[in-house]
């Protein structure tokens, strides 16, 4: 058991299924370096994020989806930028792929108007041929990562739309998570995370903004903003823990 805020009534029922990490400390007080320290182990740019290390070490179980996926919500971006899910000095193929909870989860996942699959494949093959020639000349390993990323992008156009469409989930699942397909929300991303894990994505890390509760506006104030954020996460994270367990994940 553990003490839980009264603003997380659903979560309080499953605390025995959760690990609490209390041994962390930091001398970083600004947002960006603190975010980098937490995600990469160092307060300066250039180190791989935790998801990159896991994917580098363990690989992925699904060759048609990235091994490291980053659903984002909250309407803002980290102060440290994409470095919080970057690959640092590892090949860029291990960096996180950002997903949104509204609109197309991944930008440019659909073929442009007037381009069919055969034409898209031919264009990627042509680009990769140029990259292969460039690699033969310069032997830069990052060129190989670029080739892999183009191939992954093509595969994702087939696999991603189905996996990332939460609208086809049963009604009881939407009720359990509190999801509303088509609208930007943390809950939608939590359900998406479960679907991605089911499909063999090795590392899924959710980022949600709006927790800096010391501003002057109502949504930034501790009395209002903090309670609202708790309300947004309480039901869905509880559902995720329960759902993963019942599916043997």
Predicted regions located by residue number:
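Ligand-binding pockets and gating/stacking loops
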Residues: 1-249
């Amino acid at each position: 058991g553990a003490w839980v805020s009264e603003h997380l009534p659903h979560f309080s029922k499953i605390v025995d299924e959760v690990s609490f990490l209390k041994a962390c400390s930091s001398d970083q007080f600004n947002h960006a370096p603190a975010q980098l320290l937490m995600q990469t182990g160092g307060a300066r740019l250039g180190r791989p994020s935790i998801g990159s290390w896991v994917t580098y070490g363990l690989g992925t179980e699904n060759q048609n989806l990235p091994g490291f996926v980053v659903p984002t919500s909250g309407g803002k971006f980290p102060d440290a930028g994409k470095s919080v899910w970057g690959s640092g000095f590892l090949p860029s193929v291990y960096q996180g792929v950002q997903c949104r909870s509204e609109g197309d989860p991944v930008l440019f996942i659909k073929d442009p108007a007037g381009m069919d699959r055969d034409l898209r494949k031919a264009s990627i093959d042509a680009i990769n041929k140029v990259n292969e020639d460039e690699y033969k000349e310069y032997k830069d390993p990052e060129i190989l990562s670029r080739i892999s990323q183009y191939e992954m992008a093509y595969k994702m156009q087939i696999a991603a739309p189905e996996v990332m469409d939460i609208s086809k989930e049963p009604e009881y699942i939407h009720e359990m998570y509190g999801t509303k397909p088509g609208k930007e929300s943390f809950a939608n991303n939590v359900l998406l995370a479960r679907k991605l894990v089911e499909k063999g994505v090795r590392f899924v890390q959710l980022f949600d903004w709006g927790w800096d509760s010391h501003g002057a506006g109502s949504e930034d104030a501790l009395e209002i903003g903090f309670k609202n954020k708790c309300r947004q996460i309480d039901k869905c994270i509880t559902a995720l823990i329960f759902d993963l367990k019942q599916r043997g994940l």
